[in-house]
Amino acid sequence: KETLLDQDALPQLPFDELDRFYPMQHYLNRTFLGKKTLAYHSSMGCPFKCSFCAVVPIYEARWRGKSAANIYRDIKYVQEKWGADSIEFHDNNFFVSEKRTVEFSELMLRENMNWWGEGRIDTVDQYSDESLALMRRAGCRMIFFGAETGNDALLKQMDKGGKQTGEQIRRFAARMKKFDIIPEYSFVLGMPADSPEQVWAQIEEDIAFIKQVKTINPETEIIIYVYSPVPTEGSELYERILQAGFKFPATLEDWLSPQWESFDLRRNPLTPWLTPAMVRRIRDFETVLNARFPTVSDTKLSDLQRRVMQALGSLRYHTGIFSFPYEIKALQKFWLRYRQPETEGM
């Protein structure tokens, strides 16, 4: 395999040149992390081969990160010149190296900047308590993790490095609570199974598991995706979705059709094993969950709006009556524009 580019061998990013053509201030957006949040990439790739991930065919389990010193140099420059007060790391996997994370955190201790990144539960769970405490003191406010499912057999089928388990997902949510770092868990519902009854059972199992996680750590952010197949040829999951009747587009023109554009935007899974009733069940649960636990990343919601949403969602959430939550959808549409991190990002 070809070695990934050594970013440390490159000159410093030309922020001033960019500012000449498109003001840097326009890149610094308001998020729950701060008023001027910088989006930054500190590494390339990911060393893992999850069978549902589109990154795998691109990087083929390769990862290479910029040094902590050079990351800090760039951030410090943008902070001093344009007033950046927080950072979103959009790496596919920021936390591959505990050593690099610790070195970066030590440099950030005096900067008073909140930051967010993406990682793996089974990687960060190997970090020492001292490292996690340091990260929080250095401004680490939230970490995005692909929890995916609480079912160990499905996790194995997804090839989550062979290490992540449902029990670990629950335990890790509690561990993050101890260090006041918000775990942002994404789940993928609607995976293929041998029968419609098994698909239904897995959806209900995942819903119950998500509720368990919220009981363990109510601060856990939950993002739900309906499974959209990815062409990761050679994986067990790839073979299974083909056997279940799913067909990928054959040409570039097919991929550009409105049908597949909707698929790419996660609006329509197009999977033959998922019925409209199944998709509706997932979406209705997501609506109720988001009402009961409004995302902390939505800075536009007032305290009153949050309380009203929580009140509307509470009864449905605790009784399991998720179907047809029209009152919640009407509230979200006409009284507030509820933010969706799963499609809008941070």
Predicted regions and their residues:
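Glycine-rich beta-alpha loop elements in corrinoid/cobalamin-binding modules
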Residues: 1-9, 234
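Glycine-rich beta-alpha junction loops
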Residues: 2-4, 44, 230
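Radical SAM [4Fe-4S] cluster-binding motif and immediate context
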Residues: 15-183, 189-193, 199
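Flexible glycine/acidic-rich beta-alpha junction loops that bind and position SAM and/or redox cofactors
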Residues: 48, 99, 153-158, 187-199, ...
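Short helix-capping segments at alpha-helix termini
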Residues: 109-113, 214-219
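Catalytic cores of alpha/beta
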Residues: 194-211
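Radical SAM enzyme core and accessory elements
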Residues: 236-346
